[in-house]
């Protein structure tokens, strides 16, 4: 048609029929051709309409063909719009259902969720409600249900783990607010006022270009983070205050996202504290917090009192005349040595009272009763002599023989 210099109603009708046929075939490669032909018709038709012959039959066919093309185009446009709308609704509905039942995507399934469960959903809820991490009773029950279902579906590393209960989840949130540092920020930078904490968190999220939950009109004229910090502190904000807040905030977000298992500082300090002293049964284990991450101070163990019990030792110079308390002295082999006998002999010789003293009235008494009475009402246990039998006449003549006796004081 484009090569024919003569423009007529018949050629115009043929061009429309070609466009209709190619449009209904709906091939990817035909779309540029259809657009090109339509542009050529749009350019040539206004210049040649006045010169065309009036043929009512051909004009009627042109109107019918144009109407069919118009209906087909509108139908295709509506189908395309409906397809886009349905895709959007399906995606939105699927996302809503997945969020409601907390169905993880395939990329997340590849992770070992057993390390995160059962705290996975609780940490996620904590981040979503960071301005007020106090779940309602309905939210608690929903979190418990999602956690237990996810644990069963993914498969926990500990199959004997009992299902999560509401009171356990409540305790987890209490502990999480403390260990993450949220309570510390509430106390230090929000005057322990949860309303101030809510506005402070929203201001921080806004300054970090993070999404914040919708809130009613604020009573504070400014949403600047520095203004909130200065107002809560009750004094002008210093760079040290701002840095302290940023550090506490980063530590809190890190704990909520990753927990203690993936943070080196927490488990190192916990491990050191656990190894320093074995806790007694029934005593709680010391737990480190974000604000108190310092190694536990070593305590010097109480010194055991030294025993004042004297070590018993035997005297090397036993004497029967001795009045000292030697009840704890025991006999030793050294007492039967010659050095002991020499010392005992000199002691006997220097004592006039002992020169005429015979400890054994009868030589056989020592064999019959090894325990004899000595001066001072002391009992002396004498062992049998190693030498031969002593003759009574030698004692009567004042001769004191050399006796190697092992004497034990009882």
Curated annotation (Swiss-Prot):
Residues 294-307, 375-388 have a biased composition (Basic residues). PROSITE patterns: HOMEOBOX_2. A motif (Nuclear localization signal) lies at residues 276-308. Residues 312-336 have a biased composition (Polar residues). Residues 107-184 bind DNA. Its main location: nucleus. InterPro entries: HD, Homeodomain-like_sf, KN_HD, Ustilago_mating. Residues 111-410 are annotated as: Highly conserved between B alleles. Keywords: DNA-binding, Homeobox, Nucleus. It is found in: Nucleus. GO terms for biological process: regulation of DNA-templated transcription. Belongs to the TALE/M-ATYP homeobox family. This is Mating-type locus allele B5 protein.
């Amino acid at each position: 048609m484009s090569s024919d210099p003569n423009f007529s109603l018949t050629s115009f009708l043929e061009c429309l029929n070609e466009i209709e046929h190619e449009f209904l075939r709906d091939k990817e490669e035909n779309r540029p051709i259809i657009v090109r032909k339509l542009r050529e018709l749009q350019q040539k038709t206004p210049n040649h309409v006045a010169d065309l012959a009036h043929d009512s039959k051909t004009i009627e066919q042109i109107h019918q063909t144009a109407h069919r093309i118009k209906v087909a185009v509108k139908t295709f446009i509506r189908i395309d719009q409906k397809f886009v709308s349905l895709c959007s609704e399906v995606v939105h509905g699927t996302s809503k259902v997945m969020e409601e039942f907390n169905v993880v995507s395939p990329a997340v399934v590849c992770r070992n969720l057993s390390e995160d469960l059962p705290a996975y959903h609780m940490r996620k809820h904590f981040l979503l409600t960071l301005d007020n991490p106090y779940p309602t009773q309905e939210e608690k029950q929903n979190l418990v249900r999602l956690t237990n279902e996810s644990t069963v579906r993914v498969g926990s590393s500990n199959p004997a783990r009992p299902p999560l209960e509401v009171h356990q989840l409540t305790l987890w949130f209490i502990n999480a607010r403390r260990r993450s540092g949220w309570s510390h920020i509430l106390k230090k930078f929000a005057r322990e006022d949860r309303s101030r904490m809510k506005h402070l968190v929203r201001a921080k999220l806004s300054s970090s270009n993070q999404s914040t939950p919708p809130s009613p009109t604020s009573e504070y004229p400014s949403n600047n983070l520095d203004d909130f910090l200065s107002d809560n502190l009750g004094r002008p904000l210093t760079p040290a205050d701002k840095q302290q807040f940023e550090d506490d905030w980063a530590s809190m977000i890190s704990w909520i996202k990753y927990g203690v298992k993936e943070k080196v500082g927490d488990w190192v300090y916990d491990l050191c504290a656990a190894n320093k002293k074995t806790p007694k049964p029934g005593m709680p284990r010391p737990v480190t917090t974000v604000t108190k991450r310092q190694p536990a101070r070593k305590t010097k163990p109480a010194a055991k009192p030294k025993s004042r019990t004297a070590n018993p030792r035997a005297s090397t110079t036993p004497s029967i005349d001795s009045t000292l308390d030697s009840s704890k002295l025991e006999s030793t082999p050294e007492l039967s040595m010659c050095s002991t006998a020499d010392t005992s002999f000199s002691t006997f010789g220097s004592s006039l009272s002992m020169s005429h003293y015979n400890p054994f009235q009868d030589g056989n008494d020592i064999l019959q009763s090894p325990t004899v009475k000595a001066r001072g009402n002391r009992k002396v246990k004498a062992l049998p002599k190693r030498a031969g039998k002593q003759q009574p006449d030698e004692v009567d003549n004042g001769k004191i023989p050399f006796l190697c006796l092992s004497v034990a004081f009882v």
